[in-house]
Structure formats: structure tokens, C-alpha cells
Design a protein with these regions (language model features):
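Hydrophobic/aromatic beta-strand patches that form the interior of the parallel beta-sheet core
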Residues: 41, 84-86, 137-139
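Residues at structural and domain junctions
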Residues: 4, 15-16, 81, 113, ...
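A glycine- and Lys/Arg-enriched "phosphate-lid" helix/loop adjacent to the NTP-binding pocket
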Residues: 47-125
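ATP-dependent small-molecule kinase phosphotransfer cores
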Residues: 1-71, 75-77
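NTP-dependent small-molecule kinase module
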Residues: 93-168
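A generic structural signal for alpha->beta connector loops
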Residues: 37-38, 82, 133-136
Length: 168
């Protein structure tokens, strides 16, 4: 409806659509749980906008976008700021290898973004910048050039969550 590829919609417009969707979800689904002290876990939350939409911009324009996005979602819309963001960092080459294995194991095909090597590299670059800008906690999924075990990554994630819960 808005174009043939993701770049047909500018980062600010696309981010606004997703932010409004998050706002509606917050108001309808999890606001009361959050207000009563419930623990809310989210996969991608505002971080997805920072990475995918931030990738449409370069240099200073990207940092200005990060600032705008933070203001839009947390100040103007009043969405709760996360106490902790865990970014699972993985080199693109290893991610691509895992996607090929998944395709082979399940008989499925990678989506249009997963097949775009340039897009994957751009997303990782933007995620690294966003992690620095927003203060995300980086969890490397690779050690000494090899994929860490699920259990090893889990233990690190659990330790970060446990530490955060002790602080709040």
C-alpha cells in the first residue's frame, strides 16, 4: 500500500506507525500489569524501530533519529522505558549459516530481509550504534569465532536479568 520496498516509507513515518501500534498494545494489553509492578518482557519493543528504521539514515541523521525516536515513544507517547535491553550480537556470517540450516531442516525459505546480505550487515552496524547510544547490554553470541551454546548464552542473559531485578 505504501510502496514496494521498506525504503519507500521514510524512517520517521514508518516509526510512527510502529510506535502507535506499541501504544495501543500498551493501553489495551499490558498497562495494568505494568502499573501493578508486573514484570514485562518484550521481544523487539522500541529497539526494532531504532535498528530497522535507523538503517535508512546515515551519520548525524541517524543519531538525530535516535533522539527523535526516544522522545516520541517515551516522552510524548508515555511508553515505559525499559529497565534493561539485552542485545544478542552475532556476526552476520554466523547468522546466515544458522538461517541456511533452518531452511534445510524445516523446508522453509528465508524472508526477503534474511536473504539480503547487505541489509543484514547494515542492521548489525545500526544495532551496534544504537546499543552504544541507548546503553543496551551487549551479549555476544560468539566466542573465539564460534557460536556459544544456548545454555551458555542463557546463563549470561539470566545473570543480566537477575542483576537488573536486584536494582529495581
Amino acid at each position: 500500500e505504501f510502496g514496494e520496498n521498506p525504503n519507500d516509507v521514510n524512517a520517521y513515518a514508518a516509526s510512527t506507525f510502529y510506535a502507535v501500534d506499541r501504544f495501543a498494545s500498551y493501553q489495551r494489553v499490558w498497562k495494568n500489569d505494568y502499573a501493578s509492578g508486573g514484570l514485562i518482557l518484550s521481544d523487539r519493543y522500541t529497539t526494532s524501530n531504532a535498528v530497522h528504521q535507523g538503517g535508512k539514515l546515515e551519520g548525524k541523521a541517524r543519531e538525530e533519529f535516535f533522539s527523535w525516536l526516544y522522545d516520541l515513544e517515551f516522552n510524548r507517547m508515555g511508553l515505559p522505558k525499559p529497565d534493561l535491553v539485552l542485545w544478542l550480537d552475532m556476526p552476520v556470517e554466523i547468522a546466515e549459516s544458522l538461517m541456511r540450516k533452518r531452511e534445510s531442516d524445516t523446508g522453509t525459505k528465508a524472508d526477503i530481509h534474511e536473504r539480503d546480505d547487505g541489509y543484514l550487515h547494515k542492521c548489525r552496524e545500526v544495532a551496534q550504534q544504537a546499543a552504544d547510544y541507548f546503553g543496551w547490554t551487549r551479549v555476544s553470541c560468539v566466542r573465539d569465532g564460534r557460536l556459544r551454546s544456548i545454555e551458555d548464552i542463557h546463563e549470561e542473559l539470566y545473570a543480566h536479568v537477575q542483576s537488573c531485578l536486584e536494582e529495581i
